[in-house]
Design a protein with these regions (language model features):
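Extracellular beta-sheet-rich ligand-binding/adhesion modules
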Residues: 45-128, 182-183, 187-188, 196, ...
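Membrane-associated feature with strongest affinity for ZDHHC
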Residues: 1-47
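Boundary/junction segments of secreted and surface-exposed precursor proteins
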Residues: 45-60, 115, 137, 148, ...
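Compositionally biased Ser/Thr/Gly- and acidic/asparagine-rich
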Residues: 187, 193-194, 202-559, 571-580, ...
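Short beta-strand segments and strand-loop junctions that repeat across beta-rich extracellular domains
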Residues: 27, 46-58, 168-180, 271
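Acidic, glycine-rich segments characteristic of secretory precursors and extracytoplasmic regions
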Residues: 88-180
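Low-complexity, Pro/Thr/Ser/Gly/Ala-rich linker/spacer regions in secreted
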Residues: 38-51, 494-503
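Conserved structural position at the C-terminal beta-strand
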Residues: 567-569
Length: 584
């Protein structure tokens, strides 16, 4: 028998239809000895209590079995475990550690409970009703005046404008899924944070414009607890929704996604202020979003060299959604997501990794020629992923402006791609590249783990130049023109794989030079386009809408050098062939 409970060996009231005819009641700790089988409001599920009077405990230190009463000031020196909490007699409880509590938190008028930055309140009973106001402190990363942060409140009753009173009122925003816009017009002086909803809030107007510094937000209200539903929208034009952690504790991203897999896809997007919006509301090239799913996470690596904090590296999400943090999800349909107490966790600092499962990751960054990273993508070989599109393991590319790299699965551009185990060195992963500014760029490995910690190489094959580069040892620099290129780059793991299609033999392409003209033919199929590049990736010649299996190219206008013919067939299959161009 559990401590604090006894058996009533008398048969319960058989006339009560709510009680089984042969029931014998277990009573105590919240159940009265009246055979009605219900928990009465005038009873407590907690057994004994202990009181802190400002100097000492009346009945030993707090445990899960005790109702803990603070009638004097107390500052935590370690984690606190309690069945219930009462703060009374104008006392102040300051939490510098985690509070684990089974039942309710009661804070009398004139008393205070303060949860400092990076501390959790883990509440178990989803039906427990909290009363009184909790103050939660949350520090931002270093920000300047024009930076925005996505916030969500861990308490109810927090006025939106009062949260950051020095922020201009028209710089508080909600996100509208139907129009894909941030709106300030829907908010007013009476607006309060809604539980589970994310808000974009600019830094206070008295924050320095050029010296980055942390800013501390103060939430004040009744701590949220229990199941919190939030409606999401999937429209024909957009399915991104801005949510937020509604609890005064860290949220386990994997549990949240798994519990709501019928309603949302598995990738979460976290806004980072790595890029500064200009006066016209436009962001420079790059991405402001870090991402996470079951495969792993990517950083918002893009930086604005004009941002005072541009040298500070962005953090890769680790599967923990912090207190007060807003984030984007993709809705599969119109429906409801549920935040629950079982998703709450005390995991603060440790990387979220399934250490008992096999996994192999590579993180690729693309950078401008001056070395500034533009964006980051992840390819991971992990348990649970397949070679098809998996919404929990493949994350769609989102929030990019200007030049950016992505991997491709089917026709879907991805920032995270999960691949099936076991790892096979013959695997190939196509990459896509969007360029709006011509010039030289570099693809490099940012990090790797698993099998890649050993001798397994990672190559970038450039179909336009016909080169294959081991980027574990040497970043690959290429020249790019404006456009979208989904057939140029491939990640491979074996250097000598055929540069031609596996379905098309090399001798199916015939290229020869005569009188400064190139004769190109594909006897077995029709050509659509031909582009000719030098080994630096510069476009030398382009011919489109060929619709023939033979063509003559003249007036190439280049000196003696190796060039690469990049041929697109009628079925959109690419072929790359190196040819030596000789001047007659």
């Amino acid at each position: 028998m559990l401590a604090g409970y006894v058996l009533n060996h008398s048969d319960c009231d058989d006339t009560n239809t709510l009680v089984h005819p042969n029931a014998i009641e277990i009573y105590g700790n919240g159940i009265d000895d009246n055979c009605n089988g219900s928990i009465d409001s005038d009873t407590s599920i907690c057994g004994v209590s202990t009181i802190w009077n400002g100097t000492e405990w009346s009945n030993g230190t707090p445990t899960y079995e005790k109702s803990v009463i603070f009638s004097g000031a107390y500052t935590s020196t370690s984690d606190i475990y309690a069945c219930a909490i009462l703060i009374t007699n104008n006392a102040t409880l300051t939490l510098n550690h985690t509070l684990f509590i089974y039942d309710a938190i009661t804070i009398d008028n004139g008393s205070y409970c303060i949860a400092n930055n990076n501390n959790n309140i883990i509440q178990i009973n989803p039906l427990a009703t909290n009363t009184g106001n909790l103050m939660v402190h949350r520090n931002t990363s270093t920000i300047v005046r024009l930076d925005h942060t996505l916030w969500s409140s861990p308490v109810s009753g927090q006025n939106l404008y009062a949260f950051s009173p020095e922020t201009l009122t028209h710089r508080f925003y909600t996100y509208d899924t139907l129009t894909n816009t941030y709106l300030s017009s829907t908010l007013s002086n009476a607006s309060e944070f809604l539980a589970g909803k994310g808000y974009a809030i600019r830094a206070p107007n008295n924050q320095s414009a050029n010296i980055p510094a942390e800013w501390t937000g103060f939430f004040y209200g009744v701590p949220n607890n229990g199941t919190i539903p939030f409606n999401v929208i999937h429209s024909p034009s957009n399915y991104f929704n801005l949510l937020g952690n509604p609890y005064p504790s860290t949220l386990d991203a994997e549990l949240f996604v798994n519990d709501n897999e019928a309603t949302i896809e598995g990738t979460l997007y976290f806004y980072e202020h790595t890029l500064t919006m200009d006066a016209n509301g436009i962001f420079p090239t790059g991405t402001n979003y870090a991402t996470w799913n079951a495969t792993g996470g990517t950083a918002a690596t893009a930086v604005d060299i004009n941002h005072p904090d541009y040298h500070t590296p962005s953090v890769i999400p680790n599967g923990n959604i912090q207190v007060g943090q807003g984030f984007f999800v993709m809705a599969k349909n119109n429906g409801t997501v549920n935040f629950t107490n079982t998703q709450r966790t005390n995991n603060q600092d440790h990387q979220f990794l399934k250490t008992l499962t096999e996994q192999h990751h590579i993180w690729l960054n693309v950078a401008s020629i001056d070395g500034n990273d533009i964006n980051q993508i992840l390819i991971g070989y992990v348990e649970g992923a397949t070679m098809g599109l998996d919404v929990n393991y493949d994350g769609k590319s989102y929030g990019n402006t200007g030049n950016h790299l992505y991997s491709i699965l089917g026709n879907e551009p991805l920032v995270i791609q999960g691949r099936a185990l076991p790892f096979n060195a013959t695997d190939e992963v196509p990459l896509g590249w969007f360029c709006d500014t011509p010039g030289n760029y570099t693809i490099k490995l940012s990090d790797w783990d698993g099998i890649f910690l050993g001798n397994q190489a990672v190559y970038i094959r450039d179909n336009y130049t016909g080169t294959t580069t081991n980027i574990k040892t040497t970043p690959y620099t290429f020249n790019a023109t404006v456009g979208t290129f989904n057939d140029r780059f491939v990640v491979v793991y074996t250097e000598n794989l055929s540069e031609l299609s596996h379905d098309l033999a090399a001798n199916s392409v015939i290229i020869y030079q005569k009188n400064n003209k190139f004769h190109v033919s594909t006897p077995n199929t029709i050509m659509k386009d031909i582009s000719v590049y030098n080994l630096s990736g510069q476009l030398l010649y382009h011919l489109k809408n060929i619709n023939s299996n033979a063509v003559i190219l003249n007036k190439m206008g280049v000196s003696d050098q190796v060039v690469v013919f990049h041929i697109i067939l009628q079925n959109l299959q690419p072929i790359a062939v190196k040819v030596i161009h000789k001047t007659p």
